Amino acid sequence: MAMLEYNPPTDPWTDIVFEDDHILAVNKPSGLLSVPGRLAEHHDSMWSRLQEEYPDIQVVHRLDMSTSGLMVLAKNKRAESALKKQFQFRLTHKIYYARVWGHVEQEEGEIDLPLICDWPNRPLQKVCFEDGKPSKTLFQVAKREEQEDGTKTTIVRLLPITGRSHQLRVHMQALGHPIVGDEFYATEEAKVFSERLELHASELSFYHPKSHWLRSIFVPCDFYPEAEEMIFDYFDPERKLPDYKTLPRP
């Protein structure tokens, strides 16, 4: 399933929300690739834009092109290695916000559905109980909405426990509440409701690659401005980077 047209937003060119000698955090807009695609016309990306000013910048995790929000990048090889290892051992925690179709009745819950690539229709993913990889998402209703025409939507707070490709999008579809604006997984009426995928990476906790102390970074959500820092209300990690020898292998 090829990308038909790529016109990423350019204003602002980059939106840096935090920087020190080791890491850089940026608010990626919806519609911009995290890293360059295979074709020359898909070179423009969050990484390539930052590389213009930071030649040694390294990507340690990615967001889908259609997803907006927080990306943390490494400014040197040592920081890159340290952060990638944290993602590998699942020491990082994330909070996303999404506007989904319909009213979600449960106030909160857990979606535990294994996912696998839908190869004939890649990059789509699908639920597969036989061969899928374990995938778990916690969700919580933040706000139920009703538009003037009677259309019902819900703002949900999403806490991915695993980090599979398209996990949040497929899990919300499986729950019967696809994310609005999702060209891959939404119903037609949910897809045309918004010009963009309303999925935003709002908060990330990690251990600083130099000090090894726990910290978090937050970026506001454009479609849910009420969002606020709360990652440590849901997760209670150790305050100092644990010894990897004491952790189970990923």
Swiss-Prot record:
The active site is at D64. Keywords: Isomerase, rRNA processing, tRNA processing. It comes from the Bacteria. One of its GO terms (molecular function) is RNA binding. GO terms for biological process: enzyme-directed rRNA pseudouridine synthesis; tRNA processing. It catalyses: uridine(32) in tRNA = pseudouridine(32) in tRNA; uridine(746) in 23S rRNA = pseudouridine(746) in 23S rRNA. Its EC number is 5.4.99.28, 5.4.99.29. It holds the Pfam family PseudoU_synth_2. The keyword Membrane does not apply. Belongs to the pseudouridine synthase RluA family. Dual specificity enzyme that catalyzes the synthesis of pseudouridine from uracil-746 in 23S ribosomal RNA and from uracil-32 in the anticodon stem and loop of transfer RNAs. This is Dual-specificity RNA pseudouridine synthase RluA. It comes from Vibrio parahaemolyticus serotype O3:K6 (strain RIMD 2210633).
